[in-house]
């Protein structure tokens, strides 16, 4: 059992027989009345989000979640295949569990997968990855009509917006959560 004081983003709770992950939370102490905690919870199975308010100090059942470090091997078209780093067991994950950031994964990338009762719940990808630019148009000096960015295709096939000074062959750091360019990587 956990109390509202133990809440953290990413924590998985068992509420009304359903696994709910805390997306965000806020402790609120109004000037009048008791303190409470506002949360945004995501149903791990269906993916739906719901807002729920708890009184401060309320005990909530925390789900036992086993987090395992895994290595991304390949995508067979219908599922992502990962290997457990300790047992070398291969696991197939559906695209919904990997999220939108999966398009930035290279083979042998590290992924943290959470399991409950042997069933994969969700995957946490690295916050950012370094990827090579496979193709982008040359940025011309003084070309500011496009707002200072241009499309670029990464080595994974994903397309992002990059600044005009980025060229084909450069390595860039990409945020896997938002798909945005962060910086150029110098080697």
Curated annotation (Swiss-Prot):
Its main location: cytoplasm. Coiled coil: none annotated. Gene3D superfamilies: 2.30.30.30, Nucleic acid-binding proteins (2.40.50.140). It is found in: Cytoplasm. GO terms for biological process: peptide biosynthetic process. CDD domains: S1_EF-P_repeat_1, S1_EF-P_repeat_2. The keyword Protein biosynthesis applies. InterPro entries: Elong-fact-P_C (IPR015365), NA-bd_OB-fold (IPR012340), Rib_uL2_dom2 (IPR014722), Transl_elong_fac_P/YeiP (IPR020599), Transl_elong_KOW-like (IPR013185), Transl_elong_P/YeiP_cen (IPR001059), Transl_elong_P/YeiP_CS (IPR013852), Transl_elongation_fac_P (IPR011768). Pathway: Protein biosynthesis; polypeptide chain elongation. It comes from the Bacteria. The keyword Iron does not apply. Keywords: Cytoplasm, Elongation factor, Protein biosynthesis. GO terms for cellular component: cytoplasm. GO terms for molecular function: translation elongation factor activity. Belongs to the elongation factor P family. HAMAP family: EF_P. Involved in peptide bond synthesis. Stimulates efficient translation and peptide-bond synthesis on native or reconstituted 70S ribosomes in vitro. Probably functions indirectly by altering the affinity of the ribosome for aminoacyl-tRNA, thus increasing their reactivity as acceptors for peptidyl transferase. PANTHER family: ELONGATION FACTOR P, ELONGATION FACTOR P (EF-P) FAMILY PROTEIN. This is Elongation factor P. It comes from Corynebacterium urealyticum (strain ATCC 43042 / DSM 7109).
